[in-house]
From Swiss-Prot:
Matching PROSITE patterns: RECR (PS01300), TOPRIM (PS50880)
Record-annotated Toprim domain positions: 80-175
Keyword Zinc annotated: yes
Zinc finger (C4-type): 57-72
Record's protein name: Recombination protein RecR
A Pfam family: RecR_ZnF
Its job: May play a role in DNA repair. It seems to be involved in an RecBC-independent recombinational process of DNA repair. It may act with RecF and RecO.
Keyword Zinc-finger: yes
Keywords: DNA damage, DNA recombination, DNA repair, Metal-binding, Zinc, Zinc-finger
Listed Gene3D superfamilies: 3.30.60.80, 3.40.1360.10, 6.10.250.240, RecR Domain 1
Length: 198
């Protein structure tokens, strides 16, 4: 179907978001057309602000307005434990349970040879550097329980073991093939409490 160019561009833009296909993008574009102009301007500004005002923490890799992030700056945190997660949504999920008091390291992905993503393509080198300089006694690997997450956890475990740091994995109360961000607080809390050494 032929749309006016501004609508076509908006549909194409919405389709760049994960999980948004042509029909949903079309619905969103026409909904945007029906919105008040002030709301559209505010929406567009929020999109631009996310890219301009946020950065990644130079210590852990988590999204932040200030570098280092509020978690790395918090002196009350247990600095002997680092929980390694795949992405920022996992940090947010872990923080919701309000039980984990250590630090984080965000990989921004997982090892996936099928997608051409190797260890050097995610935030693993900075993790190893961090472990050499910080006084860390335990590394909790909180990757998603899927093939890529398991591969990433095994790779990191093999790298870290020679350093002499205890490496643990979340308990397997999490469903295989699921994503950490969708787990409820109770499941995450039990997974942290029941973590096992690798």
């Amino acid at each position: 179907m032929h749309y006016p160019e501004p609508i076509s561009k908006l549909i194409d833009s919405f389709m760049k978001l994960p999980g948004i296909g042509p029909k949903t993008a079309q619905r969103l574009a026409f909904h945007t057309l029906d919105m008040k102009e002030d709301d559209v301007v505010q929406f567009a500004k929020a999109l631009v602000d996310v890219k301009r005002e946020l950065t990644y923490c130079s210590v852990c890799g988590h999204i932040t307005e200030n570098d280092p992030c509020y978690i790395c700056e918090d002196k009350q945190r247990d600095r002997s434990v680092i929980c390694v997660v795949e992405d920022d949504k996992d940090v947010i999920a872990m923080e919701k349970m309000r039980e984990y008091k250590g630090l984080y390291h965000v990989l921004h992905g997982s090892i996936s040879p099928m997608d051409g993503i190797g260890p050097e393509d995610i935030n693993i080198p900075s993790l190893i550097e961090r472990l050499k300089s910080d006084e860390v006694s335990e590394l909790i690997l909180a990757m998603n329980p899927n093939l890529e997450g398991e591969s990433t956890a095994m790779y990191i475990s093999r790298l870290v073991k020679p350093i002499g740091i205890k490496v643990t994995r979340l308990a397997q109360g999490l469903s295989v093939g699921g994503d950490l961000e969708y787990a409820d607080e109770v499941t995450l809390s039990k997974a942290i409490a029941g973590r096992t050494e690798m």
